[in-house]
Amino acid sequence: MNLTLPIELKAKLDKELGNEVEYLVPLSDLSYWKIGGLAQCVVSPNSLKSLQKALKITSEFSELPRLIIGDCSNLLFDDEGYNGILIKLGNGLNELRFENDEVYCEAGVWVPELAFHCFRRGLAGIEHICGIPGRIGGLVFMNGGSQRRGILENVVSVDVITEKGEMKNIEASNIEHSYRVSPFQGKPLVIAAVRLKLERSTRAIVRKRMHEILASRRKKFPRKLPNCGSVFLSNPKMYDVIGPPGFAIEKVGLKGKRRGNAQISELHANFIVNLGGAKSVDV
């Protein structure tokens, strides 16, 4: 793939964001699945102000695809790459601030780190996220969590940025959500930060819950081979009828099934692992 971005766009990005911009980036280096071709452009903002700039600049070139990403722990990239702009929210947006029983997190805060800091303060309520690799912005976007819970159960408010780079605050009363569904999906809004409500507890109690969750994940989930976690959504209605997706997949004899160098994990059938050199078409 050759660089095909409009000259005017590249000039603006280089001038306004400098070393926060990379070109022709191997997506296999970003994805937990270790799969993907080249991305035309990856912008990694080091502040909310830079994020606003990036969104404003790229919105002027609406003909180009644009995607907001985090740690890419839940994404499958095409072998052909991404012929557009990726805006990657990570360590540059990692402000974490505790205020009594609430915590303010910028979108790039790493989820396990947030859980750890809550434990250190004896704050409970979000232990279920402790083993999820990813950024809090992505977790809020998909109302992610574990043990059939979602992070938006604890939301106080969410700061979002519009396509034009304007910051807005949305209170919990205006955030309808359900299992793995949030109002941010399918809307031209970028999650910039979130404020969460926690509960006073003790470090011992929080530690015990986290250890139980992590021990369960280590026992059940494949960790040695590249993967992107659970592939199929556990639909609450179907769960009552056929059980979790992994059980259903195993029941029809697909556990261990291989295509190319991608395989339905022999440890947990709701995981697809990269045995080495797998392609997106294999997955």
Where are these regions (language model features)?
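Anion-binding (especially nucleotide phosphate/pyrophosphate-binding) glycine-rich loop
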Residues: 2-136
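Conserved active-site and cofactor/substrate-binding residues in soluble primary-metabolism enzymes
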Residues: 4, 8, 28, 46-49, ...
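Phosphate/pyrophosphate- and phosphate-bearing ligand-binding catalytic cores of soluble enzymes
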Residues: 23, 161-162, 167-283
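Structural signature of FAD isoalloxazine-binding scaffolds in flavoprotein oxidoreductases
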Residues: 36, 43-48, 76-94, 141-172, ...
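A gly/ser-rich beta-alpha-beta helix-loop segment of oxidoreductase catalytic cores
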Residues: 119-121, 125-156, 227, 233
